[in-house]
Amino acid sequence: MEKRPEDTRVVVGMSGGVDSSVAALLLKEQGYDVIGIFMKNWDDTDENGFCTATEDYEDVIRVCNQIGIPYYAVNFEKQYWEKVFQYFLDEYKAGRTPNPDVMCNKEIKFKAFLDHALSLGADYLATGHYARVDRSAGTVRMLRGLDENKDQTYFLNQLNQEQLSKVMFPIGDLQKSRVREIAKEAELATAAKKDSTGICFIGERNFKTFLSQYLPAQPGDMMTMDGEVKGRHDGLMYYTIGQRHGLGIGGSGEPWFAVGKDLEKNILYVDQGFHNPLLYSDKITATNVSWTRPGLMDGGEMTCTAKFRYRQEDHKVTVKMTGDDEAEVIFDGQVRAVTPGQAVVFYDGEECLGGGTIDDVYKDGTKLWYV
């Protein structure tokens, strides 16, 4: 039998934003024994000595005092550097475009932080993610958040059954607008705070400037597949497949896009047209493939839908396992700007089945020059 809410301890991962604030408020109102914990993953003191983490923690303290729950801060900077940031740099070095949010959820929020919560006697860890868990069928299923525009299952695709069984997403069945309303009605300190955007450790800083502090940039030629030089690039790591902005190629006709990379020769390939054939593919290989519940791939093959980037529409695919955590994903048609390093995430209707990392990209049986 399930424990009563008042006998159930829930640790809420609080970021200082409105979503996690409302998650904590709702759980408290439902009678749970709630503890708010702020995670510090990155020392983001800027040149002027200003640290957004300090400001965020102050917001967490204000909200927890308003709700009437205890709060703590916990530091995971070392784990974050080793598991997330190092991975981020390694992927860029390899010419790929990583997704640090996926790795942060897998290694920090729902591993290191979850373990910490359980060590405090917590029954569950709750976060302000827009996703849902369905416990009705014996196994736990992860479902998309009801607010389609805010659904965050894409970033949670690596969570396994063990993690999902200990997780709560209190705002997953709410629209973002309703979350703001609840915060305003309760007069929470974060009710009007704007949402954070971009990669957490870069914040509002310029991406190129930030990355160049850690990886030396190697400028090189920008050219067409026919070998016509169109200019210079600042370093392959700054460009992603399908990118239009920042190429600096003038002239008439359709806009120019990054369509390929040659890491050995340090060449960025460019061509014109949003629907340029060079931007389309029909198959990928994926690594680090994991599933949200056991038995999904017992047959070794499955037809489902997939997303290749956040907020993209779903595409019909066939997934074939080629190793323990490796798969071949064949598209039903062609998809634009599928990018190595990004997440491929699998769905069956509302359910998120799991996902992996896009490795090689193919078209008509030929591997594309995407890294």
UniProtKB/Swiss-Prot annotation:
HAMAP family referenced in this protein's UniProt entry, alphabetically: tRNA_thiouridyl_MnmA
Record family assignment: Belongs to the MnmA/TRMU family.
Protein name, per record: tRNA-specific 2-thiouridylase MnmA
GO BP: any one term: tRNA wobble position uridine thiolation
Its job: Catalyzes the 2-thiolation of uridine at the wobble position (U34) of tRNA, leading to the formation of s(2)U34.
Catalytic activity: S-sulfanyl-L-cysteinyl-[protein] + uridine(34) in tRNA + AH2 + ATP = 2-thiouridine(34) in tRNA + L-cysteinyl-[protein] + A + AMP + diphosphate + H(+)
Annotated segments matching region Interaction with target base in tRNA: 99-101
A UniProt-annotated Pfam family: tRNA_Me_trans
Gene3D superfamilies from the UniProt entry: Adenine nucleotide alpha hydrolases-like domains, HUPs, Translation factors
Residues that, per the record, bind ATP: 13-20, 39, 128
Predominant subcellular localization, coarse grouping: cytoplasm
Keyword match Hydrolase: no
GO function term, MF aspect, one: tRNA binding
Keywords of the record: ATP-binding, Cytoplasm, Disulfide bond, Nucleotide-binding, RNA-binding, Transferase, tRNA processing, tRNA-binding
UniProt subcellular location: Cytoplasm
Active site: 104 (nucleophile), 200 (cysteine persulfide intermediate)
Region (Interaction with tRNA): 150-152, 309-310
GO cellular component, one term: cytoplasm
